[in-house]
């Protein structure tokens, strides 16, 4: 999300008005990206001899970034999700398009235009520090996985062991992004199909959506819900009327809101908790794809359970992140590489 041209005063104004309350506009998935490979290919102690201080090094960067640039947390978590869902968890999202090249890298895709620089910067800084201690040994994809976990934990979420041993991918193509990233108006059918193509269950779909507890969205991603829901020229009937009025104040129908972002969980936007799910229970979901989880009989019971039991959600989220982190893992020189600069192939 390329944001916060939103002022602090307008954030607090929005939070004051809404006592209750990772995103792009739908397109079903057609490709068949790699499903998770067995965890035997990854291990928590993969670098125990090669770079035993790895997690301490990455942690020193993430803790500093969290204090100085808190938006780095949701930005990096979203970056990890977008990486894993396209080519697998291989750091391909970090590649920059070569100057003058017509072959655009993943990060140039429309669906990735709102990925914030704070997320990329966090990984670049962590990689530079790791390289100074363990040159050419640690993949960018492993650093991204560790950093995402760190930010989740720093924000109040679960601490889980990150299995490591990923190699960085050798390709990054913008055209592969659209069918593999959920949209802000995706239907539950589309979401279930997409997540299933990655080897993830309906429960894991709902649980991983809980990362929106510290997420933000641009007005354009939910403007249709406010003014012209599915071409009716009316707002989404599932939207709480108080919230509708407040959102229209922040996001006018035309002009003046291109840089405005609003929290997906306005009660605790920088705390990783189950507030996202309690918001859905009172029709305070900002995105149509979020609120849909509370309207569909396949997903509503899971969302209700997560809203009722914070600890159960946190445990389930850590487990789901662990599983997601094994999607499309690359191993060995035939399939991958260990980049020294996360932005360019070797």
UniProtKB/Swiss-Prot annotation:
The answer on whether this UniProt entry bears the keyword Calcium reads: yes
User: Which branch of life, at top level?
Assistant: Eukaryota
Which positions bind Ca(2+) 1? 83, 86, 88, 90, 92
Q: How is the cofactor bound?
A: Binds 1 heme b (iron(II)-protoporphyrin IX) group per subunit. Binds 2 calcium ions per subunit.
Q: Which residues bind Ca(2+) 2?
A: 213, 265, 268, 273
A GO biological-process term: hydrogen peroxide catabolic process
| Catalysis: reaction(s) | 2 a phenolic donor + H2O2 = 2 a phenolic radical donor + 2 H2O
Q: Which residues form the active site?
A: 82 (proton acceptor)
Instruction: Tell me which residues bind substrate.
Output: 182
Q: Which enzyme type, at the first EC level?
A: oxidoreductase
Tell me the compartments it is located in. Answer: Secreted
Q: Which InterPro entries does the entry link to?
A: Haem_peroxidase (IPR002016), Haem_peroxidase_sf (IPR010255), Peroxidase_pln (IPR000823), Peroxidases_AS (IPR019794), Peroxidases_heam-ligand_BS (IPR019793), Secretory_peroxidase (IPR033905)
Which residue positions does the secretion signal occupy? 1-31
Q: What EC number(s) would the UniProt record show? A: 1.11.1.7
SUPFAM superfamilies to which the protein is assigned, alphabetical: Heme-dependent peroxidases
Question: Which cellular component terms (GO) are annotated to the entry?
Answer: extracellular region
Q: What else is known?
A: There are 73 peroxidase genes in A.thaliana.
Protein name, as recorded: Peroxidase 19
Mind giving the lineage of the organism this protein is from? Eukaryota, Viridiplantae, Streptophyta, Embryophyta, Tracheophyta
């Amino acid at each position: 999300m390329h944001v916060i041209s939103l002022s602090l005063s307008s954030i607090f104004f929005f939070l004051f008005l809404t006592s209750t309350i990772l995103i792009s506009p739908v397109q079903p998935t057609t490709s068949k990206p790699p499903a998770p490979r067995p965890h035997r290919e990854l291990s928590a102690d993969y670098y125990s001899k090669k770079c035993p201080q790895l997690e301490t090094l990455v942690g020193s960067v993430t803790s500093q970034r969290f204090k100085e640039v808190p938006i780095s947390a949701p930005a990096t978590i979203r970056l990890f999700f977008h990486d894993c869902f396209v080519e697998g968890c291989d750091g391909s999202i970090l590649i920059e398009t070569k100057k003058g090249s017509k072959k655009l890298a993943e990060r140039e895709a429309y669906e990735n235009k709102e990925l914030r620089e704070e997320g990329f910067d966090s990984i670049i800084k962590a990689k530079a520090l790791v390289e100074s201690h363990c040159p050419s040994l640690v993949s960018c994809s492993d650093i991204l996985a560790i950093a995402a976990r760190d930010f989740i934990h720093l924000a109040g979420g679960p601490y889980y062991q990150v299995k490591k041993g990923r190699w960085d991918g050798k390709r990054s193509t913008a055209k592969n992004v659209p069918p593999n990233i959920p949209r802000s108006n995706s239907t539950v059918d589309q979401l279930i199909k997409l997540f299933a193509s990655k080897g993830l269950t309906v429960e894991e779909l709902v649980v991983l959506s809980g990362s929106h507890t510290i997420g933000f969205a641009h007005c354009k991603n939910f403007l249709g819900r406010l003014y012209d829901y599915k071409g009716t020229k009316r707002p989404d009937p599932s939207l709480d009327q108080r919230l509708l009025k407040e959102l229209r104040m922040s996001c006018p129908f035309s002009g003046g809101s291109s840089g405005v972002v609003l929290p997906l969980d306005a009660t605790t936007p920088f705390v990783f908790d189950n507030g996202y799910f309690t918001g859905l229970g009172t029709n305070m979901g900002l995105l149509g794809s979020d609120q849909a989880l509370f309207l569909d009989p396949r997903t509503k019971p899971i969302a209700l359970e997560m809203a009722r039991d914070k600890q159960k959600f946190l445990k389930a989220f850590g487990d789901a992140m662990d599983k997601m982190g094994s999607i499309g893992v690359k191993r060995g020189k035939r399939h991958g590489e260990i980049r020294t600069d996360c932005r360019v192939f070797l």
